[in-house]
Design a protein with these regions (language model features):
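Basic, Lys/Arg-rich alpha-helical nucleic-acid-recognition elements, primarily the DNA-binding modules
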Residues: 1-86
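Amphipathic alpha-helical interface segments
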Residues: 2-4, 119, 124-127, 132-163, ...
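Short, charged recognition helix plus adjacent turn
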Residues: 73-107
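Internal helix-loop-helix
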Residues: 110-115
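Active-site-proximal binding-pocket segments
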Residues: 170
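Short glycine-rich anion-binding loops that position phosphate/pyrophosphate groups of nucleotides
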Residues: 173
Length: 285
C-alpha cells in the first residue's frame, strides 16, 4: 500500500469531495435527496461517513453536482478503490477500531511523527522482540499474540514508501529496557540502527538527564496529510484514542498540541541523534 491508498482514508477523502462538490453546486442535502428519491438521512450519513458510497451513487452524485468528466471519473475511481478490503482484513479479530484507523492514517500520511516511551515503536520491532512483548501481553491468547506479531511485521512495509517522512523521538527508557533477552535486544538495536539510516526516517532519543519534557508520559503519534487536518493517536492506560482538530472530547487537546510538543522537544536540544555506541553499551557480552 502506498501513500493515500488505504480504503478507509479513501472513503474519508471521497465523502469530503462529495460534500465539497455539493456545496460548490449550491445544493442542500434535502435537494440532493429529492433528486434521487432518497431520504435526507442517506445524504447526511454519506457525508459524515456513517455509510459507504456505491460506485453507482458516486456517479449519480457527480452528475448532479455538474462536475467535469475528468472530475467524475476521479470520483468513480475513488469510490471503487474505497470499497476494496484492506490488506489487514485477515487480522481484524485482533484489532480494535482505533488500531484499524491508526493503520489507515499511518499509510495515508505524508509525515508521521511518533513519540515512544518504554518499548520500541512497532515499525522498528524485530519479530523476536515483538513476539516477546506480545506473548506477555496476550498470555492467555497465544494464537492472538502470533497474529499480532504478523500484523506488526507486515505494517513495517510502510517504511519503504519514500514519499512518507517518519520522525521518531524515543525516551531513553526504550533503549534501556530489556525485552526478551540480551541477544534479542542486540538484534533489535541492529535493526533500529539500520532503519534509522533510511533516507525518509529520522530517529532521536531523549536522555534521562533531560528530565521532564512536554507530554513525556504518554506515547503518541501525529499524522499529517497532503489534504485535511492532522490526526493524533494516543496510547494511555485507558486505551487507544484518536484526536481530531476541534473535536470535543475528554482530552480537550487538539492534534496541534501534540505536534507542537513534538517539535518543541525536537528543536530544544533535548532530542539527540542515536549512535551505535549508545545502542549497544547495555547489550554487550
Amino acid at each position: 500500500v502506498t501513500v493515500s491508498e488505504n480504503p478507509m482514508f479513501l472513503r474519508q477523502r471521497l465523502r469530503e469531495r462529495l460534500k465539497r462538490a455539493r456545496e460548490t453546486a449550491g445544493l442542500t442535502q434535502q435537494q440532493v435527496a429529492d433528486r434521487f428519491s432518497w431520504s435526507p438521512s442517506k445524504v447526511i450519513r454519506i457525508e459524515n461517513g456513517k455509510i459507504g458510497v456505491s460506485v453507482t451513487d458516486a456517479m449519480a452524485m457527480a452528475e448532479a453536482y455538474d462536475l467535469s468528466s475528468e472530475e467524475r471519473q476521479e470520483l468513480v475511481e475513488l469510490a471503487r478503490a474505497a470499497r476494496r478490503p484492506p490488506w489487514f482484513a485477515p487480522y481484524k479479530g485482533v484489532m480494535t477500531p482505533a488500531l484499524e484507523a491508526y493503520i489507515a492514517y499511518e499509510e495515508s500520511a505524508t509525515i508521521v511523527r511518533a513519540f515512544e516511551r518504554n518499548v520500541m515503536p512497532g515499525l522498528f520491532q524485530t519479530e523476536e522482540y515483538a513476539r516477546s512483548l506480545l506473548q506477555r501481553i496476550e498470555e492467555d491468547r497465544p494464537a492472538a499474540a502470533e497474529q499480532r506479531v504478523e500484523l506488526r511485521i507486515r505494517r513495517q512495509q510502510i517504511l519503504s514508501v519514500e514519499e512518507t517522512q517518519f520522525f521518531f523521538i524515543l525516551d531513553e527508557s526504550v533503549l534501556r529496557r530489556t525485552i526478551g533477552s540480551s541477544e534479542i535486544m542486540r538484534q533489535q538495536c541492529e535493526t533500529l540502527l539500520r532503519v534509522s539510516e533510511l533516507p525518509n526516517v529520522t530517529v532521536y532519543y531523549v536522555p534521562f538527564t533531560a528530565g521532564a519534557y512536554p507530554f513525556f508520559r504518554t506515547p503518541y503519534q501525529v499524522f499529517t496529510f497532503e489534504e485535511g487536518d492532522p490526526v493524533a493517536y494516543l496510547e494511555t492506560t485507558a486505551g487507544e484514542s484518536l484526536l481530531y482538530e476541534h473535536a470535543s472530547g475528554g482530552d480537550r487537546r487538539d492534534p496541534a498540541d501534540y505536534l507542537d510538543a513534538f517539535l518543541q522537544v525536537e528543536r530544544s536540544g533535548a532530542a539527540l541523534p542515536i549512535s551505535e555506541d549508545l545502542l549497544f553499551e547495555n547489550f554487550t557480552d
